[in-house]
Amino acid sequence: MIPQWIPQNIQKRLLLYVLQQLSLFSEIDLPNLEEVSLNNIILKDVALDPEKVGKLPGCNLRYGQIGSLELTTISGISGVNIDVNDAEIVISPDFDIDENMTNQVAFSLAQSTANLANTIMLNTNDGSDMNETSDPASEDDDEDDIDDKITKPIPPKRRTSSVTGNKTTALGGVMQKAVEIALSRLSIKVNSLKIKIVSDLTDLQMEVDSVSINSTNGTRTVSIKGVKLRTLKPNVNPGEGFQSGHAPQKKQQGSDNDSPTDANKHGSENDNDDDDDDYGNESLMDSMVFSHEEASSIYMSATSRSFEKSAASGIPGEVDNKATDKEDYSEDPPIIFYMDDCTIEFDGLSTISNLEIEVGNINLAFTPLTPTLVSIFQGVAKSLKIKYYQQKKKTKSRSAQRNEKFPQYTNDNDEIPEDQSESDDASHEPFFNRFKVNSFVISATSALSENGLFANKNGINIIFFNINIKQKNELLLYGGVETFKIIRFEDDNTYEIFHFDKPQSAPSSAPSYSGSNDVAGTSSSLSSSTGSATSKADIRFEVFKKSEESDDLEVTVLMAKSAHFNFDLQSLLILSNFAKAVSSIYDEYGLLKSVIDKLDTRDKKWSGGTNNSKMSSKSEFILQTATIFVNFIISDDCQLQLIVFPIKFNLRQEQLTISKILLNCTNGDTQVEGVIILTDVSLITKNQEFRAYFQSTNTTTSANTHPLPRKTTMNSKLSVIVQKFSSNVSMDRLKFIGEKLKNFSNEFIERSPTQSNSLENSFLNEPVERQRLESSLHMNSSLFSTRRPGRRLGLGFNNSPSVFLGSTRVTMASFQVCFKEATFNITGVFPKFGNFSVQMSDISFYKLKNDILGHILSVSVQRKKGDLVENLIHQYQDLSPNSLEFPLLSIKCKLGDKTTKIEITARNLVLEYYTNWLLLMDKEESIIDAVEEEIIEKVTPSQHSSSQNKLDIRYSMYDCMVGLTPGRLSCKSYLIIGKGDSDISFGVDQFYVKCSFRNISMVLIDDTKNILPFSEPSTSSSSSSSSATRQTPYVYIQPLDYYSKLGYIHLGLINVAHVGITFNTDIEALKDRNEKLGIKDSLTFVDLKTNLDECQFNLCADTANTLIQLVNDLKLPLNFKDEDKMKVDFADGINVMQGIDQNIFKGLTETLTELNLNGTENGSTSESSSQEASSLMFEEGHFDRGNRSLYDNSHVDPLHININLSKVKIYLHDGYDWKDTRKAIRGAVKNFETAQTAKTVAKEKEKKRKVEFETRDIEVQEDVFQETLFQSIHVVAPRNQNARDMATSINLDLQNDKDGESRDVSTANSGKSYKNLKLRRSAKHKLLFDLKSIEVGVNVYSTRDPRRDKTDENMKYELLNFIELRVGTVDIYDNVSTSTWNKFLSYMNILGDREIGTSMVKVSILNVRPDPAMVSGEAIMNVSVLPLRLHIDQDALDFLVRFFEFKDERFELPPDEMVYIQKFEISSIKLKLDYKPKKVDYAGLRSGKAGEFANFFTLDGSTLTLPKVKLFGIPGAPKIGIGLGRAWLPVFQSTQVIGIISGVSPLRSVVNIGGGFKDLVAIPISEYKKDGRLWRSIQKGTVSFAKTTGYEILNLGVKLASGTQVLLEQGEEMLGGEGSSVRSPNLGGSDNRRNSNASDELPVEVAKPKSQNNLLVSSQILNKASTKIETHSYDTKKLYSNIELDDEDMDDNRINGINKELLSKSIFLLAPAEEKLAKLQPHTKGNHEGLTEEEEDEDEDEEYQLYAYENEEELQEKLVSLYSNQPETIEQGLKSAYKSLGTNFKLTKKQLLKLRRELAETDTIQDSMVTVLKNSPIILMRPLIGSTEAVSKLLMGVGNQIDGKKLVEKKDKYPT
């Protein structure tokens, strides 16, 4: 026992020295102490001195004050108790980069007071000064504890007290021992401790109710009670249930007044604290020694110094004391953390061992925690950057001065003492023993109340119960979480969102988990040594260290129980916002960590980087879970269950694997399994290579090609790979799930921002902070990271390493998600439809910088029903995914703060359209209405949405196709889109879709059975050409080439097409806008506008017929029932005789005879007579009057369509494209030949038995062979006609091929004349339809179906739609080779220029429903046509009739519902006609065809005026022609005969001259009546007469001269001259049409070797022909599918598809295939027995190689008229005449030279005379021809000079 005789002065000095040695307080000396008893000292309102506290690690003391401090000695000096009440400390973080910081932290205040007894008694001044540091949170805890091993006295760095003397006493040794014992039993107790942390962005306050520190036998026990952490700044959302109370106000008042009593009332929860506080307060106030003046002086000096130091610090933005911040803080700062109890036990002080921590209950409010942590991370990152720049400046200045002479000492660091200390402490007990937390609860929504409990009973809590961590030895650490669950509380009900299975029998689970641990390579103590608590834990883990020297760790986490998630809407709302908050915290932490890593890298660089010798640790982490079940409650009747099979993760392999993931759906009691199945899911965290594609930027490609994507290899830091994704669900189930998910997501999106724990509600009244929270990721990275790499490289921007690093950085993706295979099966789409199957492969998405990119290698969407498979979306060649060189779909998503752009690129995809699918769909639903409602619903902006992010979607397509499959025909067509772009943008009131397509081609085939097998091109030639043009390593086949090789015909091309679609979503807002702007246009829900630049089509008769029927069959057949078309009510019976006029037929004869058919009165008279007869009154303007008035304001049209076509050119070719058509025509001729052969054999037999006259009688009585093919080709021939003549007649009819007759005769075989038929498409077109400025407008007024929708009883009639067609200009060009005219039809330009905005043809159709209850409608049509000018050549007319009358039975469709035309009106039409007949059909004339009489007369300028006609009640459009014929026929007979007769060619001049005489009299009279000027009137009449008469006389002269020239040319040609061929561009010849005959002899002739000279000539001929064809054809190259030739020779239309460069090089000229030659050689020898007739016919359509034409005559040019290129003036006439004379004289000279050479070669006089007689006519006639031509040219010039108006017509009539 310690004796009680120690003097009071010594006790007082002991306690005083304890206070002085703390070095914390301001001036404290003996006079300042108040002595209460022998062993008590009480201080009140003592301020801490920041300077004496010194440097603290990581922070600075800004202010400190203690309300009361009581020091008590126990039993003399056997122990010291320190009681502190109401301690308040203010600190600020300091991130000073100091090299000695770690050394300062190593020392404690215990070392400075190690030998207090020596200091007190002996006053030793030896020792070294040391910096003293203290932990700010427990500054009074560790200062006075003494380690037994510390014996060296360390005097404090402080001035000596006045009480301390320099004398030594005899009691020194005894007192030293006594003081050591007393200080070793030090006991500290702190009540109501407040620590305030202030920084630039964040202020925190920690409140501790009590802290007690006791030492017992070397074991320190720290007990902490009631810890609260509050957020003072920023002003954050405290959470739900927070109520502002008076407790925080008391707290602030107590801190201001520094009253320990108030602080005790507020913060104390322990009973013993009350006694201590009461005792301390009473002792201090009743003290006899302590004076109040001294106390006030002590307090004032402390606070004044504290404020001075704080103010002098000068750190901007930091808070120095509470008084300055009190006004800015909330009255009730939210509590973010509460811990009720924490006990810490450990041994030792300088070396801590046997650490045990036991925590009671922890409650954490996550709502205020999120913005607090984000603000802390931002502030720390900002401060570190500032300190970094400061340290950098110091380092630069220091490096310039230090150790310049001894650089080896630059980076000295003494690490030997640390190694020795570590080796000395290795034998001690372990540092850590146990850590336990009873419960740790995180509330996602609730706030914390003052008592530490959650304020709101409702919400979601994340609970960790009984967390244990134990250390078995220095190498093994293990533990677990006994219970982990997530619970939602709502209205006193508890719902488990997440929980593990409850523990069952131990033997069932223990073996499997122990096995997994053995595989992991960890200790078996996880299951054996942890005890019963951890063996049943939900989460277990082990941390194993392989050896003491190694830093490698093996961490194993095992969740052996099955986990269950149960989510509903409210749970997902809270947890989703919770996840967003965690993500934001993680992002900010990542930015802070990046800053710290940058600083560490800089420090290593500045320190020399000598620490690289240590090997990087290779830790291993293993995670193993059981099956996870996730349930989503979408609605009351719909639940989704996600089953995740066990998860395995190995950090060393850097891979997480899941064998399978299933998604099931539960609807009531029905469960559908396998809705979605994911197989073999892998998460790879190491760098993984994958294949990516980038758009090539090659600019060397031609205009018609597009650069292909470039394949590259990239690396990804994080990869998710799914081997197979499969889904199988019915359409009804999919609709059900989709509808429920849609409602769920809409409600989720609507309610998510309003949640209290959302990021939007984290900050209160601080929009700046919220903005920084959302954009801090980009802001912080831009402040530091973006500027550093340039400096670290030490290279300029132009140096190569920078460029290289930049390129390497591009190839590293942040993450990658890949699906190797994906399959979707949707069953029961419609009852009759079948199933949908979607198959995709190699789906990859990855993030590159801030963009998300992806691709889908192959896509296939199919409809399956039974054995039927129909493709909807597929690759056009149907290649396997392994054969594809680039993806079919590419996706790029650009993420931005204001705009998100999604770019989708499609290549080589085909979208198929099947008409029969419309029949398979549900008829009860209106497709148009459903689509309309869906679109409006999708694009209608949400009123609750406040997001400013704009979404733009762009589609791009290259070489994509749209397949058109009719419903009842076997033909098929494809639209090939070369390039297309589509932009989708969302507006406030409207939603826009803008599309642009280029190079749209159309291909067609008559029957899908005729599709040929595709042959791959040769790799050598194709690859070389491909690499040269595209620079790609693989061969790419253009879709147009592909389909052409399959047998499709290229029909047309559209240059550019623009499509714009506008969806009006807010009609009321648009109405208001239109009213303000004065816009009167009607509004529509959908507005479609299409603009086509240039359209070109090449058609034959059969392809045109197929195309028209294909378009008709692309829609559903329109059929109405009788009850839908008419209403018949038999309720009251029907009186048949009611309403019948008995005298209806009485005056019929008189009425017809009184009809006046003259002029324009015809229509009105006929109408009135019919009205009188039928007693029906027609109101013509009934529907016109109410056209739009009913709908202008109240009604909104569903759809408006506007189509504008700038130019449309339709080339009509002769011949036929389809093989079946050609075979049918040849078959008819073949049948005739067969019948003729049989007839000839019969005749020969008859001749032997019968006399001659009987045979002649039989021949006379023979009938005629006739057959009509395709309703356009009429084959008529007598039975005795030669078959060869019949074939020639058909050729003349189809091709006008006269000169080819001789060649056909030479190559024809007996009985094989049908093979001489020329039936293929001509290389040149015959007619050209040139249409310009076509406008089509469609206004849909109603889509209502009376069968489904209700009908308004007050509606008298209903407008359905209005269609208007306008054609600005119509020109039909005549290109028939035998025709000399230019335009077949055009506007009558002689009338002058048209008015701007007028159209040549205008057609308007108004569809109405007279009875709104009926489905069928009626049409009201109005047609107006401008005056027309016609130049009709009979050959062109025959071709036109034959073209449009062509009908193929294969494409006949059943008639649709008849369109009833209620009213048809056509305006008056003026016509001026020229007609040139070529032949007369006498057979038709004999059969009664009166129209053949017109072929006897040539018409020139006949005028016709067709009056205005109105027709009513026309049953169908075909009846319109009959009605017009009946209406106009009387007009021809009565009024138009004179106009027609006046146009007869011989009478034309007479009529015109007669008109001149008429003008001589009529014009003066009319002019005199106007102004009374006689002389001027006579002058005008005379001028008009002279002009007319003179022009006609000159025109007669031109005709006589031209006729003479023609006769002379024909005579010269008969005598062997060149004739009219001199005027032709080419030297005559036949039509460019080869035989369709697979002739036997011709291949043998072609197979003979030709000289190279001939080949070159041939290629030049073809090149020339190609140039001429392109002048009237496509501007780009055309390609026709004529590879499968049924003609032996090459078809000329192939020329147009051959490159000119190849033609000029003559490299394509090949003989027929060797196989074909070998096959045909036996036929040339007459060996026909081996093949049947059918085989020969099939043989005609086999493939032939291309070879050149033998001569230039095979390319026939169009005949040139003598009236072409007329001179416009007399001067031009003289020049043309001189040129004509020169040309003909040159020919005469040439002929004379030829005669001279021939005379020189003759030997006899007879030969000379023959030569002279042979050439004399030509020599004599050629000058005459030149003279007549010169005269005609001169007269033309004079005539055109006189009357220039006639020249306008001649330019239209004759080609230039």
From Swiss-Prot:
Source domain of life: Eukaryota
GO molecular function: phosphatidylinositol-3-phosphate binding; protein-membrane adaptor activity
Compositionally biased spans, kind Low complexity: 1157-1170
Extent of Polar residues compositional bias: 250-262, 1621-1639
GO (cellular component) term, any one: phagophore assembly site
GO BP terms: autophagosome assembly; autophagy of mitochondrion; glycophagy; lipid transport; pexophagy; piecemeal microautophagy of the nucleus; protein transport; reticulophagy
Membrane topology: Peripheral membrane protein
Annotated spans, Disordered: 123-167, 229-283, 309-328, 395-428, 1157-1177, 1614-1647, 1719-1741
Location in the cell: Preautophagosomal structure membrane; Endoplasmic reticulum membrane
Biased composition (Acidic residues): 137-147, 270-280, 412-424, 1732-1741
Record field: transmembrane: none
Pfam families cross-referenced by the UniProt entry: ATG2_CAD
Keywords, alphabetical: Autophagy, Endoplasmic reticulum, Lipid transport, Membrane, Protein transport, Transport
Entry keyword Transport: yes
InterPro entries in the record: ATG2 (IPR026849)
Record's catalysed reaction(s): a 1,2-diacyl-sn-glycero-3-phosphocholine(in) = a 1,2-diacyl-sn-glycero-3-phosphocholine(out); a 1,2-diacyl-sn-glycero-3-phospho-L-serine(in) = a 1,2-diacyl-sn-glycero-3-phospho-L-serine(out); a 1,2-diacyl-sn-glycero-3-phosphoethanolamine(in) = a 1,2-diacyl-sn-glycero-3-phosphoethanolamine(out)
Free-text function comment from the UniProt entry: Lipid transfer protein required for autophagosome completion and peroxisome degradation. Tethers the edge of the isolation membrane (IM) to the endoplasmic reticulum (ER) and mediates direct lipid transfer from ER to IM for IM expansion. ATG2/SPO72 binds to the ER exit site (ERES), which is the membrane source for autophagosome formation, using basic residues in its N-terminal region (NR) and to the expanding edge of the IM through its C-terminal region. The latter binding is assisted by an ATG18-PtdIns3P interaction.
Family: Belongs to the ATG2 family.
Protein name as it appears in the record: Autophagy-related protein 2
Gene that this polypeptide is encoded by: SPO72
